[in-house]
Structures are given as C-alpha cells and as structure tokens.
Amino acid sequence: MAPTNLTKKPSQYKQSSRKGKKAWRKNIDLSDVEQYMEKKIDHEITHGTSDITSLQNDALFHVDVEGDEILKNKLIKRKQIKKVLKSKEILDAVKTNSKIAALNHHKNSSGNPNKIQGVSKHELKKLMALAGRVHGESKIKNRVAKDGLVKTTAGDLWGEESNSKKQKVKLPSGIKLDVEKKDQIPEELLKKSTTSWSTASVRPSTLDIEPIAVKEFTEIPHAGKSYNPNNKAWSELINKEYKEEKAREDERIALEKYKERIRHLMETLDDNEEEESSSNEEEEEEEEENENENESTQCSGSDKEIKLSINKPVKNKKKTKYQRNKAKRHEEKVKLQQELKELRQRVKDLEEVINSEETEILSAIESDSNKVKKSKKNKKHKLGTKYSVIDERLEIKFSDELSDSLRKLKPEGNLLYDTVRKLQSSGKVETRVPVRKGRKYKQKITEKWTHKDFK
C-alpha cells in the first residue's frame, strides 16, 4: 500500500514569546516530532510494522521484470530495439504456459534404434576396426585399406639422398662443396685455405682470460647521493669528496709552483752569463791586485813597529756582490740538477717495476695456460693509451641544496657518462681523447711586390 499523503497545517507566523516561561512552553514548535510520528504510522500501514529495520530485503524491495512500457515504445520508434509481434507473443505464451509437450520431427528424434549417439552402427564398426577393437581383424590392414599406404623404405623427401653419388666437403675457409665420390680431392685444398680467411679450428685461449680491471667501479652509488640521504652517509660522502678534491688541488698548486720556478730560472740564467762572468772576474782581479799593493805598502811601513805574533793578522774578507750572486746561482743550478737526477731515477725505477710485472705476468701465463685467469688491477688506470680512465664526477649536494620533496628535485648524473666510465674501468673500451688535427706545414708569410706596378 502506498504511503498516504497527509495534508499539513498551513504555516503561521512564528513570534517569539513576550510573556514568560509559561507562554514559551505553550507556544513550542513540535513539527519535527509530528512528522516522525506520521512516518511511523505510514510504515505500519504499508509494511505492517513501524520498525522497518527488522524486515528482510524481500519485504522492502521487488525486482521489476516487465520494464517501463513508455520507454519501450520510445526505443521501438527510434528503431533501437525490434518490435515483438502479437502473434509471436501468443505463441511464446502458449509454449511457456501449455502443459502439453510440443511435437518432435522424425529427423530430429533421438530415439533411432540403428544409431548410437547419432552415429550409425556400420560407421561405428569401421571406426572400431581402425582402432583395433574388433576381434579377428588386423589394425594395420584396416589402416592400409583406408589410407592406401604401401610398404617402402622410409626416406625424407626434402633431405639428402642416401644413395647419392656426391659427397660434401668442407674447406678450411668454411665453404662447402658437392664433389663426386670417384673424384680425388688434393690434400692442399683440404688443409690450406683458398681465401683470405679461415674458420677457427682451435678454441682461442683468450676466452679463458677475464678482462683487465683497469679501475675499480662501484655499480651501486653511495647512500649519501640520495635525494633524501641519511645524515651520517651524507657527511661521510662530503668528507671523502673533500679529501680527494684537496689532494688534486694540492698537486695542481705544487705543479704550478714548480713550473713558475723553472720559468724564473730560465729567464734569469742567460746564455751570455759566461762572458759577463769573465769580464767581471777580470775587474775583480784588478781590484784584488790594487788591494794587495796597498797591503804591501802598509806592511813595509809597519815592519818598523814591534810585533807580538809572527803570523799575519787575520782579516774578515767580505765577498763582493758579484761573488754572492754567482754563489747563489751556482746553488740553484746544483739544486735543479739534483731534482732532475731524482726524477730520472724515479722514472727508471718505475720502468723496472713495469718490466718486472710484465715478466711475472708472462711467466704466470706460461705456467697456468689452462687455468682461468683472475681479473688484474691496473695501478695506473691506463689500457692501450697514455690516457687514464675518466674520473667520477662530483655529484654531491650541500645542505641548502637538499630538497625536501620530489617536486623540487633536480636530476643529477649522466647515464651515458657512467656507461662509458664502466666500459673503460672494466677494460672493454680504451680511453680516448678528441685531438684536433694539426697543420702539416707551417704557414709562410710573404710580402707581395704588386704595389710597385702603380708607381
């Protein structure tokens, strides 16, 4: 039963009480309570109980099977669904509502005594004979009768002929030839290659040798390089990178100082030094002779005086400016020669170490030729060229550069750079540096004399 639509009282103007507590109690608004009570009465009329939560779903809802007729007619007009004819509706109603079974055609009837599951007995006997289920009949004979097989030698139609008069010969270069059996093939053709190449017959020993580990390469980056790193890992990375960069900077500064020193020596030590020194020496000798003459005159005058000692008096002979400069230059020359000597000795020691390492490697290869070699570490980080493996880039962020969210994150590193460094470190690729092609000959500047034609 549908809920009854109760007409509500017309709403009146609500004025706040002007009297007191009694008037307020008298004029209180009870519209919400009245609505709730009316709803309860409606539920009691429609569902038989005021509390509908205790009822099952079947009592509250029902499924509409028929559908909306108005909507159906609209869809038929738009040709979105087909219109069901009245005759078909009557026949469908008879089919569903009639208690008498429909008539079956003799062709569709399954109660044929000569057929088993729709297969005739004659056809079934043939199938049983092919399967070898009939007593007294051969399975092979039935198969031959059906397929028409003939007993012959088994042979692959697309394969090689078994009774062929030709044989295949493989040359050292890998070329295959069809040669008749009666023909004799020369041994030179079988042993020596007729082309500029030949197929490998022996397994190369280099397959057992691992590539040389030129430089250590870490696959997983340091934890301090994360976009949100741990404080301990980040400080470790900062200290590590600082030490490496400081060592490089100290080496660079020392090299610059050494170059500046050599340049200064080359500027101060001129080629005309010997000529200048000889002229200065002559001047100094003349000065010394004059001093000796003065001393002799003084001595002759002082012979008359009384002497306490037989020996000549000791005099502090002061060096001239030229002598001091000469001694200073000599000291610098000696020091430079000593440094060059030490450098030569160091280079010689390095060459001896390299030669000894090479001899050790050769002896190890000869002794353990069949064993798999371990990866050798190269101390100089060089392979095949004079250039060492490219260094790892400085990929570190300071405390103010660290981002607290992925939106502010800036990508670091270069995948191509890391791949090349990995290939160079593992010894698979040699280190190369782009070099500009120089001039074959020096440019010659000449003055043209064409301006004389206008005079």
Curated annotation (Swiss-Prot):
<feature type="compositionally biased region" description="Acidic residues">
    <location>
        <begin position="268"/>
        <end position="294"/>
    </location>
</feature>
<comment type="function">
    <text>Late-acting factor in the nuclear maturation of 60S ribosomal subunits, which is required for normal acquisition of export competence. Required for the export of the large subunit. Acts to stimulate the RNase activity of the exosome complex, and may recruit the exosome to 7S pre-rRNA for processing. Associates with numerous RNAs including the 27S and 7S pre-rRNAs and the box H/ACA snoRNA snR37. Also interacts (via N-terminal region) with the mature 25S rRNA and the mature 5.8S rRNA.</text>
</comment>
<keyword id="KW-0698">rRNA processing</keyword>
<feature type="region of interest" description="Disordered">
    <location>
        <begin position="264"/>
        <end position="333"/>
    </location>
</feature>
<protein>
    <recommendedName>
        <fullName>Ribosome biogenesis protein NOP53</fullName>
    </recommendedName>
</protein>
<keyword id="KW-0690">Ribosome biogenesis</keyword>
<dbReference type="GO" id="GO:0000463">
    <property type="term" value="P:maturation of LSU-rRNA from tricistronic rRNA transcript (SSU-rRNA, 5.8S rRNA, LSU-rRNA)"/>
</dbReference>
<dbReference type="GO" id="GO:0005730">
    <property type="term" value="C:nucleolus"/>
</dbReference>
<dbReference type="Pfam" id="PF07767">
    <property type="entry name" value="Nop53"/>
</dbReference>
<dbReference type="GO" id="GO:0000055">
    <property type="term" value="P:ribosomal large subunit export from nucleus"/>
</dbReference>
<dbReference type="GO" id="GO:0000027">
    <property type="term" value="P:ribosomal large subunit assembly"/>
</dbReference>
<comment type="similarity">
    <text>Belongs to the NOP53 family.</text>
</comment>
<feature type="modified residue" description="Phosphoserine">
    <location>
        <position position="31"/>
    </location>
</feature>
<feature type="compositionally biased region" description="Basic residues">
    <location>
        <begin position="16"/>
        <end position="25"/>
    </location>
</feature>
<keyword id="KW-0597">Phosphoprotein</keyword>
<feature type="region of interest" description="Disordered">
    <location>
        <begin position="1"/>
        <end position="25"/>
    </location>
</feature>
<dbReference type="GO" id="GO:0000176">
    <property type="term" value="C:nuclear exosome (RNase complex)"/>
</dbReference>
<dbReference type="GO" id="GO:0005634">
    <property type="term" value="C:nucleus"/>
</dbReference>
<feature type="compositionally biased region" description="Basic residues">
    <location>
        <begin position="314"/>
        <end position="328"/>
    </location>
</feature>
<comment type="subunit">
    <text>Interacts with CBF5, FPR3, FPR4, NOP2, PIH1, RRN3, RRP6 and PAP2. Interacts with pre-60S ribosomal particles.</text>
</comment>
<dbReference type="InterPro" id="IPR011687">
    <property type="entry name" value="Nop53/GLTSCR2"/>
</dbReference>
<keyword id="KW-0694">RNA-binding</keyword>
<feature type="compositionally biased region" description="Polar residues">
    <location>
        <begin position="1"/>
        <end position="15"/>
    </location>
</feature>
<dbReference type="GO" id="GO:0008097">
    <property type="term" value="F:5S rRNA binding"/>
</dbReference>
<dbReference type="GO" id="GO:0005654">
    <property type="term" value="C:nucleoplasm"/>
</dbReference>
<dbReference type="GO" id="GO:0006364">
    <property type="term" value="P:rRNA processing"/>
</dbReference>
<dbReference type="GO" id="GO:0019843">
    <property type="term" value="F:rRNA binding"/>
</dbReference>
<keyword id="KW-0539">Nucleus</keyword>
<dbReference type="GO" id="GO:0000460">
    <property type="term" value="P:maturation of 5.8S rRNA"/>
</dbReference>
